[in-house]
Amino acid sequence: MLGQLKTEQKSNEITAIPLLLELLELKGCIVTVDAMGCQTAVAAQIIKQEADYVLSLKGNQGLLHEEVTDYFAWAERINFKDLEYDYCATLEKDHGRIEGRRCWVTEDTEWFTEKAAWAGLRSFIMVEAEREVLGQAPSVERRYFISSLAADAKQALRAVRGHWQVENSLHWVLDVAFREDACRTRTGHAPENLATLRHIAVNLLKQERSCKLGVKSKRLKAVMPQLCAEEWRNIISASKVWSG
């Protein structure tokens, strides 16, 4: 977690994302944003800061998601014949689970009538994830993205997977190790302050590599010396009272 910004009561993530981006040094980076942040203002801000973007598409962007979905469906029907595109595939097997991913990237964007509204738009991306778990029916999911990157399928897939891993890992750690969802603090700036402290703690704990422990166990280890010291103080205090 590099930064966060509290949204106003009558605002939302859409208006907050460009403001948050301004706080970060992004030059030369690839910025991935979920579907809510797939906005022309967000794309423009990222390009302004000399970075690249991979923005997730869903139905919240009018016809954009439908148009990109239809484009890739058509491209598949003609087997991408005469189209400029790049493709890669990965396969991972682990403990009764098989995960395959395929990625197509094309720079064929001239057909998109709203291209000028999206700063730096250079490519469309389709990622297919197929998962087989022992004893369960296979599942297939396709996701679509717009990007300022050139047609490099391996690079695009790394960016997309990195986004999923960070998002899933961070949310899981905050919920399981820090019990964020159970927190009922609602007064004043307390929720924002506590969230900031949690994110700082997560960053510090993940940088601690002297022991092979999970974040939750690292938290416990970090406070153990303090707990022991407190326990000894109590013992000493009790002994003084007893001797007195």
Q: Can you name each region flagged by the protein language model?
A:
Residues 81, 173-244:
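A short, flexible helix-boundary coil/loop motif
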Residues 1-29:
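Electropositive, glycine- and tryptophan-enriched low-complexity nucleic-acid-binding patches
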Residues 14, 39-43:
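Short, well-ordered alpha-helical microsegments
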Residues 58-162:
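An anionic, glycine-rich sequence signature occurring as long contiguous blocks
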Residues 43-51, 73:
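Short, surface-exposed basic-aromatic patches at helix termini and helix-loop junctions that form
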Residues 150-185:
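Short amphipathic alpha-helical "interface-anchor" segments enriched in bulky aromatics
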Residues 17, 30-38, 53, 145, ...:
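Short, conserved catalytic/metal-binding motifs centered on acidic residues
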Residues 32-40, 58-63:
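Acidic, metal-coordinating catalytic cores used for nucleic-acid/nucleotide bond scission
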